[in-house]
Every structure is written in C-alpha cells, then in structure tokens.
Amino acid sequence: MKLVIPKTVNIVELENAPFKCAKDADAWARSHGIVGLMSNVDTAGKGEVAISVHSLNKMLSGSALAKSSTPALHFAALMRLRDIIRESFVGEVHPDYIKVDGKRSPDNGINPLVEIWVLYGCASFADFPCRVKTTLKRFLDNNFPSKAYSYEISNIEILRGTVAPVARPSNKISMDVSILLNGVCDVNGVPLLDVCEIETVADGS
C-alpha cells in the first residue's frame, strides 16, 4: 500500500551557525536543547523521537557532513533540527537492512527489531530552498522511542511560484511536495512520487 504524503510542507527558516566545526557544533547542540526526547506532540504525531549524544556523533561525522551540500548548510540545519523533524513528513518506511562491508542491502538480511522511517522536509537558507532528509530508527517494541539517526540537507532548484503562503494565522511558507521530491528515489531506487500518494485537500486538488 502506498504511503499517503501531504500536498505541501512548511518551510523551516535557517540561519548561519555560530560554529564552523563538528566539535563546536556538538557542544552547541548539547547546550541549546537539541539533545533530548521529543514527545509525540513535539514531532507532530510521529511518535516520540530521541536525539541522543550518539545521534550527534553520527550526524556530525565526516561521512554525514559529506552528504549535505556544504558544512555550513549542515550546521545551520542542526540548529533547527527539532523544528525540521516536526515539519517533515514520513516519505519512506523500510526494513533496517544489515550492513556488510560498509553497505546495507536486502541480500544481507534485516534487523527484526527495527524499521527505518525516512522523513522529508523543506528548509530555506539565504533565501534558497533546501531538501532535508532525516532518518529515524523506529523500534518495533513500542516501549522505546524512535532514534534520530542521521540527516542530510541539499539545495534544490525550483521554478518561480512553487512556494506559497499557508493560510493565516500561521504566517508560514510552504512548498509543493511534488517539487520537493522531484527526482528523489527510495531505498530501492524507485522515484518516491511513484510509490507515494499525495493526499487530496478539501477542494479535491
């Protein structure tokens, strides 16, 4: 069954981070409330999500930084990570494939205790839109919160008129999900827009 995803996603505004290296980013995140448990309300219905010190280590590793467009963009997203998780939607759900020789594959088997949720969201940095992909490890035993595992942020190109204000009083800006996910493939290499169903709104659009 196809995942139903929203028609639009709210854009999270980013600012330049006051740090330029992973060590300082780690210290800032620990002292500014990034680490800790997000409630179901905090995540806008995605369940509890834990952002741990181990999560930070993974998110600020060299390999994680390399997946984002620039380190500056990666650090800017860290400062708003909780907001990004809240405003993002679940775009993929798949098994936790076992890693062998540095690669995860269905051929290697799966971890039966965990499934992977991939969240997609939108941010704006220096007036340029960005796609944010956040990976959660969701424990199938509901007694444990999901674990924020990694995130990556990349610049995207859009056409004029593809962002629009959300109805007041939110005063937020949104992006059409069909634009956000254009060219994005799931873990199996299939375009996400082919395997997800965009929800309809009241006017049927």
Where are these regions (language model features)?
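Ribonuclease/tRNase effector modules and their secretory precursors
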Residues: 1-205
